[in-house]
Amino acid sequence: MAFDVAPRMSSPATSTPPCPGDLDLKALFQSVPHWHQRWEIFQGIFTPGRNSVEALLANSEVPADLTGKRVLDVGTFNGCCAFECERRGASEIVALDLQTPEELGFTALKAALRSNRVRFHRGSVYHLDPEEIGTFDVILFFGVLYHLRYPLLAIDQLRRVLRGTVYSETLVIDERFLAEGKDFQRLSSYHSALTQVPLWQFYKANELAGDYSNWFGPNIQAVLDAFESAGLSASLISQWGDRAAFQAVAGGADTMRQSYEGASEIVRTELALGH
């Protein structure tokens, strides 16, 4: 899953271990097909991705101390965010993605780190079952939302396994609305009120960055309202360029229950929306 992050603030330092003397770093880095994330794996040594995990967690205000917390990392990719949570003291981390851990480089990184509290779960955000994976104090939902064909369903599913806070980061279209002619414009350049109206821009092919995995670009208000409609209380934490970070906790009104779909036992059973 893609995300681009510019630093906004510094996170308190966590304990980064020295590189084991018996580890072949060159072999490790070459064994991974694609390094997506940049993270200080050992003191002074960074994975060769371009997306800074440190900046992402800082912009999202993920606590430096996660002692005793149970964490779900949705769209984990290389696993760097999950392993950073382990470093910050989380008691258990479930790293979720669609591909195999070998394809993503997760297995190689886990072995190099000698991690014992992070486990990989191959699956989809659309099928989060608390009876299978439990519930979580912290859910990381970074660079995923705009890659989803069914974003509201995904947020409903996050609510099922949440007992704490969702930290979410996504593309937003407030500063990057794709206009006719494939030019990007500020949403407010069309009308100042549009940033206050929940909007989702649909990408039917690869209009955004030449990537067929991009489906919907929300504006900030749409993200807030989507979480609220799932029974979560959401807030904007930071915005930089065409990215924004949010936090959401349980406590809002579940408007899904008041809809025709929400009132349908068939729909709620088939989609497992029994929160």
Name these PLM-found stretches:
Residues 69-77:
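Conserved class I S-adenosyl-L-methionine
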